[in-house]
A protein has these predicted regions:
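Outer-membrane beta-barrel "beta-signal"
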Residues: 207, 233-246
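Outer membrane beta-barrel transmembrane domains
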Residues: 175-215, 221-223
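Outer-membrane pore/translocation modules
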Residues: 70-163, 189-200
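Outer-membrane beta-barrel initiation region
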Residues: 22-54
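Short loop/turn motifs that connect adjacent beta-strands in outer-membrane beta-barrel proteins
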Residues: 19-23, 56-61, 91, 130-136, ...
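Transmembrane beta-strand segments that form the barrel wall of outer-membrane beta-barrel proteins
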Residues: 28-34, 59-70, 90-98, 105-109, ...
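Residue-level signature of outer-membrane beta-barrel architecture
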Residues: 32, 53-55, 83-85, 94, ...
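Cleavable N-terminal export/targeting peptides
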Residues: 1-25
Length: 246
């Protein structure tokens, strides 16, 4: 189901944008951990890489995203399609974390059977208000397929993460973004848990400070971020730099 959906979106984007110019982009970030929606996915020295192909005057992107750490206990490889326009952005990301020691199926990359697969398809719709004085970001993400199952592995739970973010400060190359997110399951399947926590509620709050550091003729985007999860009573600090931006 996931591969069919991704293929359909890719074909649709291609048919709409065949005559437009295309661009290849490569980024690589160095960070002390990987934080995602209230969770610390991995810690240690990490490299997170994004290789993408953008076409249709910037309205469509096909990409590969990967992450690993120096300890060798975190390995992730995803592919995605993104469509954007008029302030909206839709992204379908097929996520596969095959880190050693995982409690799910981390050995069969091409297994797309709902009750066996170790991957999940996360679909996100973002909207950024276009008014310069009110650049609020609103986001809705639902896991449509994969390892977001009921305890008896008979139903998909469609865990959903909703998020709002606002740039509270922007001056002299500095930017400060504040955000908050909550999670719940569209199909509770008789359970309280969802993909992000033990029950519905706020699982993510963050404050991120970014700066474009000038080193000679080079610009290195750097950031520091605090993230708090009130449900799990955990907090994390992240610092990172984008070493490659092509």
């Amino acid at each position: 189901k996931t591969s069919i959906l991704a293929s359909a979106m890719c074909l649709a984007a291609s048919s709409l944008c065949q005559t437009a110019s295309a661009q290849i982009h490569l980024t690589a970030d160095l960070q002390n951990n990987h934080l995602w929606r209230g969770m610390e996915v991995a810690d240690g020295c990490l490299i997170l890489t994004d290789l993408s192909y953008t076409f249709g005057a910037g309205h469509a992107t096909l990409g590969l995203w990967g992450g690993t750490n120096t300890q060798g206990n975190y390995k992730e490889f995803n592919h995605y399609v993104t469509l954007r326009g008029a302030g909206f952005e839709f992204c379908a990301m097929d996520t596969y974390n095959f880190s050693p020691g995982a409690t799910y199926n981390n050995r069969q990359y091409f297994n797309y059977k709902a009750h066996q697969t170790g991957r999940f398809l996360n679909c996100t719709l973002n909207y950024r208000f276009q008014q310069p004085r009110f650049p609020l970001l609103l986001s809705w993400s639902t896991i449509m397929f994969g390892r977001d199952r009921s305890a008896d592995n008979t139903e998909q739970k469609y865990s959903t993460f909703v998020y709002a973010e606002y740039p509270v400060y922007k001056k002299d190359g500095w930017q400060v973004d504040a955000g908050v997110g909550g999670a719940f399951a569209l199909n509770k399947a008789g359970e309280k848990q969802n993909f992000y926590g033990e029950t519905s509620g706020v699982v993510h709050a963050q404050l991120k400070v970014s700066y474009d550091l000038k080193i000679g003729s080079y610009t290195v985007p750097v950031h520091a971020m605090g993230m708090w999860n009130p449900q799990s009573e955990k907090a994390y600090f992240q610092i990172g730099a984008q070493l490659i931006h092509l």
